[in-house]
Regions:
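Amphipathic alpha-helical interaction elements
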Residues: 6-9, 40, 275
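Single, function-defining residue in the core of a domain
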Residues: 46, 63, 98-385
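Hydrophobic, well-ordered secondary-structure segments
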Residues: 16-19, 30-44, 121-130, 139
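Short amphipathic alpha-helical surface micro-motifs
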Residues: 1, 31-34, 70-74, 88-91, ...
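Gly/serine-rich nucleotide phosphate-binding loop at the start of the catalytic core
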Residues: 1-29, 35
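Active-site-proximal, Lys/Arg-enriched surface segment
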Residues: 22-102, 108-110, 226-229
Length: 385
């Protein structure tokens, strides 16, 4: 916050800006709606691919909003299994950049509270419901990992005509469709057929192919079938069992199960679509490491979520500029040694600091004529006339 205040032309005391953030009436959902519309207009998409995931931000203070002893399911080397941290649930939009690179642009985040009945599943559903008014009736596909693949979240999404692709537990109860009887019998018709056992899964046809996923070409072994998921109350899903070949260890990885409610999709397409979820992991890393999320100090949940929304908005706009403004970007002024190289969000952020630091926006607005004239740049000397 201090760095943000120091970057503007201040006309009030420092405390005024802190109080503006703490007592302001800015609603995070309105900011999220406006941000979503900007992304949708800049990068039109026939189908909206949304990603939902959670992350932990370590905290020393036990009195910080939402700070508690939480389980770290990342299982990183030399890291404790439980730590004092805040848990955030984020909803982002998956977009494709140059060379097919996958990005996730954060739209809105919510802090998991310390007390109450609101858990991550309820918050994730609330985030989708909050963005529904600005989705403009477009087809929506939501991607998430195994933790969010629960009936409590998936069934309400399906009732909203949304599509879901997610990883599930390998022991998820799956059944073949029931056999259609030529002659009707008495009683209720069967919902499930034969249960899928490990033996029946191994008996499925195997397909081996090479796909470029997660940044490299990988050899993948696939098995797929259309089955009925019991935790979804018998809804048909396309089940894909996939294993990756580890060239270093010369062995296959453990089998992972992906479920897609779009049964018309092929196993290859499901794998490609689910790989777009991984873009949220570098997003969390960059927000924590380079965009100050690790240093959020606000002592009230509402203020903390507001500043998190401001940081997410800044990150999304920077990444959006790197995707749509590459041809007109002044790379020879910002970083001439990076000429003819792909434009990154870091270069855009550097240009924004050079262009807008110390810019007196209030001086550019004429109250008498109600006309805004872009003020003279008085920050970085490279942009002075």
């Amino acid at each position: 916050v201090t760095r943000a205040i120091s970057a503007i032309t201040r006309c009030r005391h420092w405390t005024t800006y802190y109080k503006l953030l703490e007592r302001g009436s800015v609603r995070t959902l309105r900011l999220a709606h406006a941000l979503f519309e900007v992304v949708n207009n800049a990068l039109p998409m026939e189908t909206l691919n949304l990603v939902i995931d959670d992350t932990l931000i370590p905290r020393q203070s036990e009195t910080a909003p939402g700070s508690a002893i939480r389980h770290d399911h990342a299982k990183k080397t030399n890291r404790p299994q439980f730590l004092q941290a805040q848990c955030w649930v984020t909803l982002g939009v998956s977009v494709l950049g140059n060379g097919g690179r996958k990005y996730v642009l954060p739209i809105v985040s919510r802090l998991v509270p310390l007390a109450g009945n609101r858990n991550k599943l309820i918050i994730a559903l609330a985030l989708v419901r909050g963005l529904a008014p600005v989705m403009m009736n477009k087809p929506v596909r939501i991607l998430f990992d195994a933790w969010f693949m629960k009936a409590r979240l998936v069934l309400p999404l399906l009732s909203r005509k949304m599509r879901v692709i997610g990883q599930a537990r390998r022991d998820t109860a799956l059944f073949m469709p029931p056999v259609v009887l030529l002659k009707p019998r008495r009683g209720r018709p069967k919902i499930y057929g034969v249960k899928m056992t490990p033996e029946s899964i191994l008996a499925l046809p195997v397909t081996e192919l090479k796909l470029t996923l997660y940044g490299k070409e990988q050899l993948i072994r696939l098995r797929t079938v259309v089955a009925m998921a019991r935790f979804l109350k018998g809804r048909p899903v396309r089940a894909v069992w996939c294993a990756f070949y580890d060239a270093d260890r010369q062995c296959w990885s453990k089998v992972r199960l992906l479920l897609a409610t779009e049964i018309e999709l092929s196993a290859e397409n499901i794998l490609r679509l689910y790989a777009r979820r991984w873009g949220i992991e570098p997003l969390f890393h960059n927000l924590k490491r380079w965009w100050g999320v690790n240093n959020l100090w606000q002592q009230k949940r509402i203020v903390l979520e507001l500043w998190m929304q401001i940081r997410s908005t800044a990150w999304t706009l920077v990444q959006l500029l790197s995707l749509v403004a590459e041809e007109s970007f002044p790379i020879t002024v910002v970083a001439p040694w990076r000429n003819k190289q792909p434009l990154t969000g870091g270069l855009v952020a550097q240009w924004l600091r050079m262009e807008f630091t110390g810019l007196a926006f209030r001086d550019g607005f004429n109250r008498k004529s109600s006309i805004f004239t872009f003020p003279e740049q008085c920050g970085d000397p490279r942009f002075r006339g």
